[in-house]
Every structure is written in C-alpha cells, then in structure tokens.
C-alpha cells in the first residue's frame, strides 16, 4: 500500500461520491441558511498534514511531543479570533457548535441547574434544551419564544419567564430567527435575575464580525459560535468571552479534558485562515451583500404571496410559512430539490405539523452570495420558487424551472 496513491485509485467509490457532490453544488442554488462555500485556502489548510498530529492540551502545555508547529497554528487561530470579535479569550478547539455549547454548560453550571433558552419550535436549537439532546437531559430548561402575531421575541415576556423561574443561565441566539436580537436587553434581564448570559451566535457570526449585527461579546458572559455558516470557514466551533481571567480556565478545562480529547489541528488551522479572511476589507462588503440579498429575496417572495414569519428579515435568514400555498415544508423541499434549489423544511412558530413534515422552509443567502449572485438574481429565484409551486404537478414546466436554475449556475460558477 502506497501513501502516495490518489483517492481515485485507493477508493473509487468515495471519489465518485465526492465528484457527485461537487457537481450537485455546482449545479444547484444552495439556499440552506446554515450552509456556505469555503474558500480554497480554507480547504487547503483542512486537507493538510496537520491531520496527522495529535496535540492534546493547549499551546505550550501539550501531552505529546512534536507540537511546536501546530502550536503556531492554534496560537494564530486564538489571536485572530480575539481580534476579529474584540474578545479577551478564545478557545478554538470545539469540534462543533454543539460541543462548544455543551462545554460552556459544564464549565459554569452543575447538572440539574435551570437554564432558559429559546424554544426549538420557535426558532431555537437542539442544544438549547431539547429533551432529545444532552442539554435537555442534564439540565432543567424553561423556554421563551416569539409572539404569535409578530413572530418576534417579546423581551418583556422573556423577563417575566426569567423572573418566575430564576434560571442560572439564559441562552440567547437561534437557528431560525430572521430578526436582529437585542443582546443588551437580554443582558439586563440576566442581570436582574442573577443569571449567566450565554449567546450562541452561530448563524450571525459573520454579520457580527462585519459590524452588521449587534455584537454579543460586550454583554454576554460567554459567546459560542460555529465557524462555518456566515463566517464561511470550516465546520467547527468557537468559544469567546470578554473576561478571560474569570472564565478562561473553566472553559479550557471543560473543553479538554471535559468534553473532548485531541483537537483537530487541521481544522484549527482552517479556522485561523477563515478568521484572517474575515478581517479583510472585502469580507464586510460580502456580509452587506448577504443581508441585501436576503431582503431582496424576502421582498420578492412577499410580492408573490408567500407568508414570511415576522414579515421579513434583518439578517441572512428567511423563514417561510407555506400554509397559504397549500404545500408542506417537506413537499416543498422535495419539489425545490427537483428543480435545483436546495432548502430545508422547517417548523414555523405554533406549527400544527410535526417537525418531519413542517409547515415551512428555512432559506438563506450566504452560499449564493459567495457565488456572486445579486439582488436581481434573488428576484429570479423567487420567481422560480413560485413557478415551481404553482406548477408542481406539471413535469414539463418543472423542467423549465430547472433550466432557469441551470442558467443562473452557469453565470456564477462554483470555484
């Protein structure tokens, strides 16, 4: 067996799967709000020899020899993350956002403590207390949500819930909330009831880095995020805080040896590259285009009779309630897949359907904006979506919709 043989020879089945996925990404419009297109530089770092190196511990304090060069990569990732977000502390080792959240819970709380998070059915996340997740099994959760009439967080009601339940931690952030979140107000609520504030900014980290959304770092005790999504890095997690002296050691110990063993040094190097890219002038303009594209897409959908939760968007994400179109989220996801538009079915607040069917879809603009699509293209995408739903039973017309998607993809090649 030779270590130098190419993948196509060693494992043609996996090579074929990668080729097929590459073609899928090239030939479809990616509207899943949590997905993006990593740069060649990020992928080069992630596919480097750093994948060979075990490095349990932290820079300068490893349990293995030969870590002097991976220490350089991790130190760069830490310093860049701190600079990018104005933080006093950063841990770049979490393998995912879920593990970042879990580490924070175990760093600051004891099993059985009460946490208040956003209801999954209203746009929260599994790791914010779902009973099927470790968070909901080890801690007692109470939930806040959105108003039925507005689709927005009611901060006064949020305070009432916090005052009643006296949580030890409040978790802010969401996976399907299209509006700006006021972290200052939530910090006031947390302070009033004596709770820690943890902000999960996984979806909006890129917008925060670009100054297009209020940063939670000055207000939260701890901030977690993924490093992909709007940040456009590798799939991974990150923990930040302002007060390194108060929280740094606790967080480091909770990550390693608490919930993880060896860090993924190739992924950490890719994170460092992504943080550097996010500090370049063009990144802020890219984030502006994400938001302007999302608003253009939202407006175009509204004009075509789609109902949007909260009536629009302030960020990269749109939550579409499809009940007025007489189609479920699952049916729409399958329909749009057929014409080359990738979305995910998603529950809407107060959804009568079960999650595996759902009444809505969640869409977003990070990936299509990375490809270069503009506001005019968003109008065309809305037209395609509306046309596909209207003619969902007409194969010939669905083929026409697919052809329009092919035209757009040809104008904006992937890589």
Curated annotation (Swiss-Prot):
Single GO MF annotation: glycine hydroxymethyltransferase activity
Statement: the UniProt record of this protein carries the keyword ATP-binding: no
Disulfide-linked positions: none
Pfam families linked: SHMT
Reaction(s) catalysed by this chain's protein: (6R)-5,10-methylene-5,6,7,8-tetrahydrofolate + glycine + H2O = (6S)-5,6,7,8-tetrahydrofolate + L-serine
Xref: CDD domains: SHMT
Gene3D superfamilies recorded: Aspartate Aminotransferase, domain 1, Type I PLP-dependent aspartate aminotransferase-like (Major domain)
SUPFAM superfamilies tied to this protein: PLP-dependent transferases (SSF53383)
An annotated GO cellular component: cytosol
Keywords: Amino-acid biosynthesis, Cytoplasm, One-carbon metabolism, Pyridoxal phosphate, Transferase
Positions of post-translational N6-(pyridoxal phosphate)lysine modification: 229
Keyword Amino-acid biosynthesis tagged: yes
EC number(s) stated in the UniProt entry for this protein: 2.1.2.1
Coarse class of the protein's main subcellular location: cytoplasm
PANTHER family: SERINE HYDROXYMETHYLTRANSFERASE, SERINE HYDROXYMETHYLTRANSFERASE 1
UniProt xrefs under NCBIfam families: PRK00011.1
Family of this protein: Belongs to the SHMT family.
Name of the protein this chain belongs to: Serine hydroxymethyltransferase
Lineage, broadest ranks: Bacteria, Bacillati, Bacillota, Clostridia, Eubacteriales
